[in-house]
Amino acid sequence: MDSTSSLHGSSLHRPSTEQTRTDFSWDGINLSMEDTTSILPKLKRNSNAYGIGALAKSSFSGISRSMKDHVTKPTAMGQGRVAHMIEWQGWGKTPAVQPQHSHESVRRDTDAYSDLSDGEKEARFLAGVMEQFAISEATLMAWSSMDGEDMSVNSTQEPLGCNYSDNYQELMDSQDALAQAPMDGWPHSYVSQGMYCLGSSDAWEASDQSLIASPATGSYLGPAFDDSQPSLHEMGPSQPASGYSALEPPPLLGGDTDWAPGVGAVDLARGPAEEEKRPLAPEEEEDAGCRDLESLSPREDPEMSTALSRKVSDVTSSGVQSFDEEEGEANN
């Protein structure tokens, strides 16, 4: 007990330098073992920072080296050395006659290749690869251009002939249909085919006696237009017209003759020859069509005009009347 107490006492009464040294050597270890919560996080933080810095440095060096090996170096060789190697090998020139001593030529080529540096060897390899790619690309482009020319020639030749034949066939069919149309149902058939248009919905009604049916002009005019136009007596002599029977076909649009449907054989005297030869303005042509129709529909005989309008209305409304009758019977 005395010895231990004397040791502790002597250690406490030592000079300051020795006390600090013993504190670092002994007491410091005791503190590190006791207060682990305050020292271990510092060590952990230092190790993490060092590891992250080393990892970043190694990663940056690795990335820079890989970029230099895979991007910078081939680009530099592609810009300068590849062209030089292509010119040095003499590609694109006519092949020379092979020498008799092939083994010696192979040996010289091998020696020349072995004397090259690593960059020149890589450039030579890249030049060969680029040559093969160029040959393949040129071949593909030649084939594709030939196929494109064939397709363009076929596409320009076929539509012209097809369109011409289709248009000609449609024209012939329309002409045959017009020639074979029944004469008795001429107003209804021509209106249904779109040859003439109706100016109003009640143009075919029999109650309105003042409506004017004008096949020559292709329209049907109401009483308002009839009132605005001058009468036949005010305009002067009658316009030329030729007679057509009910069995004869109607003239086409723009013809110089008129036809009265439903009226038997009507013979009208032609006007003077100079009236036929004189050119007419568009307004005068419309007036002439109206005057021709007025001359064909006599006003002094109301019974004939009533019969004419009734026949025309019966032709167009026969289908509607039959449908109404069937609907009424079904309702009853």
UniProtKB/Swiss-Prot annotation:
Name of encoding gene: FAM131B
Region of interest: Disordered: 1-22, 95-114, 222-332
Name the record gives this protein: Protein FAM131B
Q: Which UniProt keywords apply?
A: Lipoprotein, Myristate, Phosphoprotein
Give all Phosphoserine modified positions: S47, S114, S117, S295, S297, S313, S317, S318, S322
Q: Bias regions of kind Acidic residues — which residues?
A: 323-332
Q: Which GO terms describe its cellular component?
A: cytosol; nucleoplasm
What Pfam family is a match, any one? FAM131
Residues with PTM Phosphothreonine: T316
Supply the source organism's classification.
Eukaryota, Metazoa, Chordata, Craniata, Vertebrata
Q: Where is the composition biased (Basic and acidic residues)?
A: 101-111, 272-281, 288-302
Regarding protein family, the annotation reads:
Belongs to the FAM131 family.
